[in-house]
A protein has these predicted regions:
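Extreme N-terminal starter segment of soluble prokaryotic enzymes
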Residues: 1-4
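Cysteine-nucleophile active-site neighborhood
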Residues: 48-117
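Amide-donor transfer/coupling interface in amidating biosynthetic enzymes
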Residues: 102-199
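Conserved Rossmann-like nucleotide-cofactor binding loop
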Residues: 11
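Short acidic/histidine-rich motifs immediately flanking catalytic phosphotransfer sites
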Residues: 36-46
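Short acidic low-complexity segments
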Residues: 27-38
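Structural alpha-helical scaffold elements that stabilize or flank donor/cofactor-binding regions
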Residues: 35-36, 65, 167
Length: 199
């Protein structure tokens, strides 16, 4: 299985590649439109700002290719946020629009720092192949200052003084707000499940 990890000039691409290769996948970090279009799976990692990511995607000629990609796709951290319509970040950014709603700044209790950084339990809300074998209450590693809206796409949430949609799905597109490549056994299981999805 050939996995294309989309490189937008920032992000945790090397650690994602290493995590996938440990599971036996052939993973390439690329911004080449032809490689991305032909991949059997697509990973959209990201750290940083939504507006910058979408601008780079457009500059590289990848926006329409990613929007039209019909095989399994997973967005990680910022990559999950990019699956939604809009973000408040950078004064407002238009995103891929697979899932309705606006990504907003994380508004939590005064005693909880933002960004949300560290290990937080996952609560599964729906059964989904991506969550097969992931224990209820498993810990995942989060680093984020913005949060996706809670929609019918939410598969799992985390409690950080407010409910954080931790995993989402729309058709053949999944998202993790956390970093599965840094989330020990639960993260490895989620990536294994992603590799095992039917194309």
């Amino acid at each position: 299985v050939t996995i294309a990890i989309v490189h937008l000039g920032a992000g945790n691409t090397a650690s994602v590649q290493f995590a996938l290769e440990r599971l036996g996948a052939h993973a390439v970090v690329t911004s080449d439109a032809a490689v991305i279009a032909d991949a059997e799976r697509l990973v959209l990692p990201g750290v940083g700002a939504a507006g910058y990511a979408m601008t780079r995607m457009a500059e590289l000629g990848l926006t329409d290719i990613i929007k039209g990609f019909d095989r399994p796709l997973i967005g990680l951290c910022l990559g999950q946020q990019l699956l939604f319509e809009r973000s408040q970040e950078n004064g407002g950014a238009t995103m891929l629009g697979f899932i309705p709603g606006e990504v907003r700044h994380l508004d939590t209790r005064p005693d909880l720092p933002v960004p949300h950084m560290g290990w937080t339990r996952l609560e599964k809300l729906k059964d989904d192949p991506i969550l097969d074998g992931v224990a209820e209450g498993a810990y995942a590693y989060f680093v984020h200052s913005f949060v996706c809206p809670d929609t019918t796409a939410t598969l799992a949430c985390a409690d950080y003084g407010t409910e954080v949609p931790a995993m989402v799905r729309s058709g053949n597109r999944w998202g993790c707000q956390f970093h599965p490549e840094r989330s020990a056994e639960a993260g490895a299981r989620i990536l294994h499940n992603f590799l095992s999805l039917p194309a």
